[in-house]
Amino acid sequence: LAPALSLPGQAVCPELSSSEDNACIISCVNDESCPQGTKCCARSPCSRSCTVPLMVSSPEPVLKDGRCPWVQTPLTAKHCLEKNDCSRDDQCEGNKKCCFSSCAMRCLDPVTEDSFQ
C-alpha cells in the first residue's frame, strides 16, 4: 500500500479546464473509491476520475461533515451542456458539499453516516 499523504494543507481537485474532453466517463464515485493519494475529481462537466490532488495551504482547512448523495448515472453517455457551480466544498455555502449531480457539479446538502442504507 502507498503511504497516506502527509503534506500540510488541504487536498483539492484541480480546476476544470475548457480544453478537457467532454466525454461522459465516470470512473469513480467518491474519494474512497480511488487509490490512496488520489481524489475523485470532475474532469469535464459529466465525467469523474481519480486524480492526484493539488495541495493548498490552508490555516483552517474546510472540513464539511457528511458525504455527497448517491447519484444514478445514465447507462448511455449524453453530452452535458450544464456548467459546474463548484469544484470544491469550500466554494459552497453553509454545510453544502460540491457534488456530482448527474451532469455537472452542484452544491448539495450532504448525507450523514446514519442516512446510508
Swiss-Prot record:
It comes from the Eukaryota. Disulfide bonds join 13-41, 24-46, 28-40, 34-50, 68-99, 80-103, 86-98, 92-107. GO terms for biological process: antibacterial humoral response; innate immune response. Pfam families: WAP. It is found in: Secreted. InterPro entries: Elafin-like_sf (IPR036645), WAP_dom (IPR008197), WAP_four-disulfide_core (IPR050514). The keyword Secreted applies. Could be a protease inhibitor. This is Whey acidic protein. The gene is WAP.
